[in-house]
């Protein structure tokens, strides 16, 4: 099954996540089909906290990709910010 989930990056004590489309059997930070955005939970100042390619996210959801709980909330937040 194809899922949209977060892949962790960044360094110790400073997380940074990529929103990735991947097979659910792949490792969290492993192989992916496409990166559709990023999430920076510790963004400060002028840094961007969330960026999502809405067009690609809509495409993958239309193809049957299942978002994780956190990604579903982030997609909702991104849609609200763009509206």
From Swiss-Prot:
The keyword Secreted does not apply. Pfam families: Ribosomal_S16. Keywords: Ribonucleoprotein, Ribosomal protein. GO terms for molecular function: structural constituent of ribosome. GO terms for cellular component: cytoplasm; small ribosomal subunit. One of its GO terms (biological process) is translation. Gene3D superfamilies: 3.30.1320.10. The keyword Ribosomal protein applies. Belongs to the bacterial ribosomal protein bS16 family. This is Small ribosomal subunit protein bS16.
């Amino acid at each position: 099954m194809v899922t949209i989930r977060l892949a962790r990056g960044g360094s110790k004590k400073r997380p940074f996540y990529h929103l990735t489309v991947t097979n659910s059997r792949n490792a969290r930070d492993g192989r992916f089909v496409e990166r559709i955005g990023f999430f920076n939970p510790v963004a400060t100042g002028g840094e961007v906290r969330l960026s999502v390619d809405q067009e690609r996210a809509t495409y993958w959801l239309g193809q049957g990709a299942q978002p994780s709980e956190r990604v579903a909330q982030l997609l909702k937040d991104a849609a609200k910010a763009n509206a």
